[in-house]
Amino acid sequence: VKNHDIEAAWNYHNATKHSHESIRANRHYLDWENQPKPFKIYSQLEPIPLPEHLSSSGTPALFAVSAADADAVGPTTLTSQTLAEILFLSAGITRRRPYPGGEILFRAAACTGALYHIDLYAVCGNLGGLDAGVYQFSPQDFSLRRLRAGDYRAVLVRASGAEPSMADAPCMIAGASTFWRNSWKYQARAYRHCYWDNGTMLA
């Protein structure tokens, strides 16, 4: 059943859009003593290191994202190696730059305020080198952490309304926002950023 009542969406949009007045009237400040952690940490789960030797497909990025079908950009066999490449190019740390008092981490996909609130999860069947399960991608040490053992892909297929393109996918990658990591700076606008930043990673 489609929901044609979009009044709530318009109300949110109008309440959170920027204007000359709203920017000057907002007294919000960054509470550095309460800054969110930049990563979700599962301290009691063992990391499963991902392959660190990442190859290049040789395909220009604009061609890859505009291709009409998967065959245009090469084979689609998925292994832990190709999964590592996808995760790195979506949310990986591409460079580290030290500065007095810390380190700046550059990521593969841009994010509002460089807060990187979208965490990625791989839901897969048995892949070459990786058992079926639900895994959290940990960019800080380039590893996976298994949250659930077993094949949960059917759960996502049902949640999608039985989307045909998902039915035979060997792996699905889901993005979820750690909302506080973004709203700490952007307050109510963070809900917009969940979609902007997730879309940037998916592209």
Predicted regions, residues:
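N-terminal accessory segments that position/regulate proteins before the catalytic core
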Residues: 1-203
